[in-house]
């Protein structure tokens, strides 16, 4: 299907381009979202008559997104989630969770703007791209932790999962040493009378 793009569409073209796309892409994505018009003679004439207005609106939207992006770019958000000992989350962090975290801090982001290749399923610090406009993309940092204290440790660059394993190993070694010396928890010297 031939369409006229009303804004830049990644991998397809820029404002004003007359391109041929698959019917499903046009019917399910471009046309319902107002990103394109069918390339008919009437629509071509209408587009050319309104081209300056459409371009001005696009520039205004881009500038607004760039201004919003300057405030959000590089910001860090903490998400507290439950996770197992290995750092695997019970569930995952999706685009909606990222958008909600940004909105909670006063940002103007919709979940469709969040670009995640796949949901985040582990604890740690993750970089996430947010596409505010077809030409404005920013990066925010998500600090996913089990507690506020753990989030602060991760923010300092500490690998919380590895340090937890080291603490567990040290505790086990201390318990084994204590048992070997006949300290608390050993059975040496315990007398049971029947």
UniProtKB/Swiss-Prot annotation:
Chain ranges passing through the membrane: none
Pfam families: Ribosomal_L9_C, Ribosomal_L9_N
One Gene Ontology molecular-function label: rRNA binding
Keyword Transmembrane on entry: no
Disulfide cross-links: none
Keywords assigned by UniProt, alphabetized: Ribonucleoprotein, Ribosomal protein, RNA-binding, rRNA-binding
Any one GO cellular component localisation term in the record: ribosome
Domain of life: Bacteria
Region (Disordered): 148-194
GO terms for biological process, alphabetical: translation
Cross-referenced InterPro entries: Ribosomal_bL9, Ribosomal_bL9/RNase_H1_N, Ribosomal_bL9_bac/chp, Ribosomal_bL9_C, Ribosomal_bL9_C_sf, Ribosomal_bL9_N, Ribosomal_bL9_N_sf
Similarity comment text for this entry: Belongs to the bacterial ribosomal protein bL9 family.
Summary of the function given for this chain in its UniProt record: Binds to the 23S rRNA.
Protein name per its UniProtKB record: Large ribosomal subunit protein bL9
Species the sequence originates in: Caulobacter vibrioides (strain NA1000 / CB15N)
Taxonomic placement: Bacteria, Pseudomonadati, Pseudomonadota, Alphaproteobacteria, Caulobacterales
């Amino acid at each position: 299907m031939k369409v006229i793009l009303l804004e830049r569409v990644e991998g397809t073209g820029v404002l004003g381009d007359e391109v041929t796309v698959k019917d499903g892409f046009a019917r399910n994505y471009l046309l319902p979202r107002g990103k394109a018009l069918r390339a008919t003679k009437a629509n071509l004439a209408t587009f050319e008559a309104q081209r300056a207005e459409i371009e001005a609106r696009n520039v205004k939207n881009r500038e607004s997104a760039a201004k919003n992006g300057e405030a959000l770019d590089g910001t860090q958000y903490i998400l507290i989630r439950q996770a197992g000992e290995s750092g695997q989350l019970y569930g995952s962090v999706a685009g909606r969770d990222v958008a909600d975290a940004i909105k909670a801090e006063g940002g103007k982001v919709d979940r469709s703007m969040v670009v995640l290749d796949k949901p985040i399923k582990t604890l740690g610090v993750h970089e996430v791209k947010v596409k505010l406009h077809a030409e404005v993309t920013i990066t925010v940092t998500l600090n996913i932790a089990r507690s506020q204290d753990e989030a602060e440790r991760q923010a300092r660059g500490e690998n919380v999962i590895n340090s937890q394993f080291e603490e567990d190993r040290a505790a086990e070694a201390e318990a084994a040493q204590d048992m070997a010396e006949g300290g608390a928890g050993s059975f040496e010297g315990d007398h049971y009378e029947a």
